[in-house]
Structure formats: C-alpha cells, structure tokens
C-alpha cells in the first residue's frame, strides 16, 4: 500500500465522522491529504489529524475531482445529494447511511463476512456500510453460518443512545442529572424518557408492525449472506447506555451443533473476541465501548430446540458498527483493486 489517497470525510463534525478520522490515523491509512467536509453551519472548525489541525470545509464549495475515497456519514439526504456527484468525479464513496444499502447494484459490505462483494463498487463507485446492529450480528454469525448453516435468527437488540447521535447522548445525560435531583426530565430526541428506561422502538414503524431498524436487519442479513431463505425475527430496543450495542441472539442451525462446536469456529474467526466461561461475559460498557472487536459470550445450546444455539454479542456501535467497518472496507478496496 505505497500509494497514497486524497480522502474526504463528509460529516467530519459528527461523532462517526470524528471517529473515522481517528481510525484513519490509528490504522495508518495511506492518506495523502485529508478533506474534512460538513455543512456551512459546521464549516470553519477544525479536526485533529496526524498531529495537525485541519480545517473543516463547506461541502457546497468542494471540488470532488480532488478526492479518490470518500467516507460519508452526514445523513441520508446528504448522501443522496453528494454521493452521485462524488462518484461521477472518480471518488469512491463508502456510505454509512441507509441511502444506498438496498440498491441491487451497490455492494453492502462487512469485510469479515463478504469482502468479495467490494468488487461491485465499479457499478456506481459507491459501497454501502451496513447498519450497526447488522454488522456486529453478522460478524458473529458468519463462521456459524459457514460451518453449520443457519435457517432462522431471532434477535433482541439493546442499543445505546449514541446510535441516535450527539443530541441523544446529551439528552440521556441531562435526563439522568435532572431525575437524580428530583426534577422532571424533558424528552426531545426520543418519544419517551430514555433515562432509567428502555424503549422498544428504534426508527419509525412499518406497515407490518416492525420498525424500520428491525427490518434493516432482515433485509441486510439476506443481502450480505446472499441468502433469501434465511429468516430473521428482530426486536430492536433503545437502552440508557451511552456507547455500545448488545444483542441476545437465538439461532436455528441447519446442521445440528453443540455449544462447543460453535465456540470452536468462533475461536478462529476474524474480528471476534470470545468469552468462553459462563462466569465471564462481555458488556457494552466494560468491554466494547472504545474498542474494535465484536465480543461474543453466553454461548449455549438452546434447551427448547434441537438445532438451537444462543449467544450474546456486544460491540462499539460507533467504531465497528460504523467508522471502523468503513475504514476496513477502504483497506480492502485499496489492497485488492488499486
């Protein structure tokens, strides 16, 4: 990777954009020049990169022919407007929104799961980053899927407020502070109080009674695995945790598997840190927050189903669930296609 690339981070003032810039530096991505971009409201500020302060530029004034790789994390409307323009000017867009995920000609990629799909970036010069909850689930399930097959996935998520952005983090902190002082909590980001509470709604409700967040996990799992026969039954829940998503997953495998068989394939899988004993298990706060792996624990045989396996999966939704996965896509892109 001696070649260097001019890199755009669109949404550089947001939590995911800032983390992308940190990870580009941490992983020594070959950046010739970094262009942090944002709306006019956020332009003029700076970000730190490789020991220097780099000015955040106004996306409206940017010449896209200057960049070869663009990381987009500024919302679906922004990606809808700017990704085609960037792509037409030769910038490969790695988009962290849901704008292009379900387009048949746009690859949806988790490098540990389906890196070969990146080859299809040539269709439109756009690669989609999956939803955070899908990413950590499929990193954990890919080795099981390959070894035993999976016919059905039941999953309940416990998703931190950082998945809703900086305003949600501020709202949780503010509500906690007020409630502990005996004052009423005000809710703006969420429909109900999030502090000391759990909300069984993430995103809007669909006609079938599932939320859009839940249906993302269905659609994305089938697309990434290339398997329309796999059945996914999700319930997505927002919990009063700042960083890190957790998932309780029940699988039905095609071939029967014991817990030790599943642990054996997880032990060798990329991107996974396995907790093997019953007494040790990962949590979003104590293990995943601020780290890169997908953590798996509580692996056990389902006592109610002969082909059932249960496991507990946690990961940092801002890192592996968004920024890190995007940078890993770019690493495969420049390694295999440049």
UniProtKB/Swiss-Prot annotation:
Protein residues bound to NADP(+): 13-16, 41-42, 162-163, 317
Domain of life of the organism encoding this protein: Bacteria
Catalytic EC class: oxidoreductase
EC number: 1.2.1.11
Gene Ontology biological-process annotations: 'de novo' L-methionine biosynthetic process; diaminopimelate biosynthetic process; isoleucine biosynthetic process; lysine biosynthetic process via diaminopimelate; threonine biosynthetic process
Keywords, alphabetical: Amino-acid biosynthesis, Diaminopimelate biosynthesis, Lysine biosynthesis, Methionine biosynthesis, NADP, Oxidoreductase, Threonine biosynthesis
Binding residues annotated for substrate, in chain numbering: 159, 238
HAMAP family listed in its UniProt record: ASADH
Binding annotation for phosphate: 101, 216
Family label: Belongs to the aspartate-semialdehyde dehydrogenase family.
Active site: 132, 245
Identification of the protein by name: Aspartate-semialdehyde dehydrogenase
Catalyzed reactions: L-aspartate 4-semialdehyde + phosphate + NADP(+) = 4-phospho-L-aspartate + NADPH + H(+)
Pathway annotation: Amino-acid biosynthesis; L-lysine biosynthesis via DAP pathway; (S)-tetrahydrodipicolinate from L-aspartate: step 2/4; Amino-acid biosynthesis; L-methionine biosynthesis via de novo pathway; L-homoserine from L-aspartate: step 2/3; Amino-acid biosynthesis; L-threonine biosynthesis; L-threonine from L-aspartate: step 2/5
InterPro entries: Asp_semialdehyde_DH (IPR012080), Asp_semialdehyde_DH_beta (IPR005986), NAD(P)-bd_dom_sf (IPR036291), Semialdehyde_DH_NAD-bd (IPR000534), Semialdhyde_DH_dimer_dom (IPR012280)
UniProt GO MF annotations: aspartate-semialdehyde dehydrogenase activity; NAD binding; NADP binding; protein dimerization activity
SUPFAM superfamilies: Glyceraldehyde-3-phosphate dehydrogenase-like, C-terminal domain, NAD(P)-binding Rossmann-fold domains
UniProt lineage: Bacteria, Pseudomonadati, Pseudomonadota, Gammaproteobacteria, Alteromonadales
Its job: Catalyzes the NADPH-dependent formation of L-aspartate-semialdehyde (L-ASA) by the reductive dephosphorylation of L-aspartyl-4-phosphate.
Assembly: Homodimer.
CDD domains reported in the protein's UniProt record: ASADH_C_bac_euk_like (cd18131), VcASADH2_like_N (cd02316)
